[in-house]
C-alpha cells in the first residue's frame, strides 16, 4: 500500500513524513518550497511495510518557477497512492489552496484523511470544526513537530489497510531458536594445509593464539535487498535528468539552475528482474557557496547518502574541467570505501573530441579516479544509459564475491615465495594464514607474528598482489592484521 502526503507549502508535510517513517529523510525548514520532488519512505509496523510519498507544497498562485513541476509531481503521487493524506495548518483555518486541493482529491474516490497539523495546544484543537467545510469526513488533529497524536493517525492507516493487530504473544517476543546464531568457529585444523608456511610447525602458544582468533572471526551473509545506487555530483551536472532518462518518466524535477534538488530522493526501479534504489542527491557545493540552512542540510545529506549506498555514481559535466567539488566528492567516496562508477554526462555537447583521449586525460587529473569505470553518456539523448546497469552489476558482483580462504592463502603464499619479507632485528614477518573477512567493506584479515615486522613497502606489495589476483582495481579494500601477543617477561 502507498500513502501520499499532500498539501500547500509549509503546513508540516515533511515533518509528518519523518514522524511516520521515524527517520529524518525529508529536509524540514520554515522556508516554503523546501521539498520539491517526490520523496519515498516506509512505515514498518504490524509486521508490514507501507510506502509513504512526501510531495512538495502545492500553491497554484505562486510565482515560483518550479511550482508547475511541483504540482505535477504531487498529482502523480496522488494517482500512484491508494490512500491520501491532505495536510493543513489548523492554526490558519481553511485557505483557498486547501479548498482547491480538496476539490482535486475528493473526485479520485480514494481513502482521504484530513490531517490538521500543528495542533500544539488545546486552543488549537478548538478550531477543528472550521475544517468541516472541506467535505472530508475522516479528520485527525496532529502535531508532527511535537509527536502528538501520530499514533492515532497510524492506527487509522492500519484500519484502512486492513492489517490485523498482532496478538500479545506475537509482539516483541523473540524465540530462542530465532536468535541469530554466530557462524561456526573456523577450525584451525581445517586449514592446517593452507597456512602460508606449510613446512614450519606452530608452537603451542602460536596454535592457541591462532585458534582463539579464528573462533572470534565471523563473516555476515550478504543482505537480500534492492541494490542502493547514489548519484553524486556538484549542482547542475544532470543527476536528476539521468534518473528520469533511466526510468523514462519525470520522477525528479530538473532545471538549469543549480540546487534544484534539495532532498535525497529514493527511487525504486526494476531492470532485468533486478531491484535497484536510485538515490538522487543534492549537489555538493563549495562551503562558501552554501548560503542558507536548507542548502547546508542538502550537502550534509549528500554525505549521508554516500555512507548508506552500495555503489556511487559520480556524475561530472563533460563540458567542464574536473572541479574542486568533484575531487572533494572523490575523496569522500574513497573515505567511505565505496565502489564507484564515473558518469561523464552531456557527451552530446563534446563535438570532435575522441572519447578514449578524454578518458585517458581524465584519469590523470586525480589519483582517486585510478582504474574506475568511466562511462560517457548523454541523459538528454539517452545515449549509453543501459551501460550504467552493466557497470553497476559488474562492480557489485566483484565487491560482494566471498573469496575462499584456501584461494586467498595460496595467492599470498605465492607472493611471499616470490619476494620474501626483509629481516628486521633477526626476525622475518610470518603470516600464519589469511581470510576474506567482509565484503562491505571489502576486507582481508591476516594473522601475523608481529606488526613491527610488517613494513609499508611490503604491505603495499601484498595489497597490489591481491588487487591483481582478484580483479579489485575498481573495488576499494583494506588489509587488517591480528598479531600474536608479545610474551610477558618474568
UniProtKB/Swiss-Prot annotation:
The keyword Nucleotide-binding appears for this protein: yes
UniProt binding sites for GTP 2: 233-240, 280-284, 345-348
InterPro entries attached to this UniProt entry: G_ENGA, GTP-bd, GTPase_Der, KH_dom-like, KH_dom-like_a/b, P-loop_NTPase, Small_GTP-bd
Coiled coil: none
Domain EngA-type G positions: 1-165, 227-400
PROSITE patterns according to UniProt: G_ENGA
GO biological process terms, semicolon-separated: ribosome biogenesis
Domain of life assignment: Bacteria
Keyword Repeat: yes
Alphabetized NCBIfam families for the sequence: GTPase_EngA (TIGR03594), small_GTP (TIGR00231)
Family statement: Belongs to the TRAFAC class TrmE-Era-EngA-EngB-Septin-like GTPase superfamily. EngA (Der) GTPase family.
Classification via PANTHER family: GTPASE DER
Name recorded for this polypeptide: GTPase Der
Originating gene: der
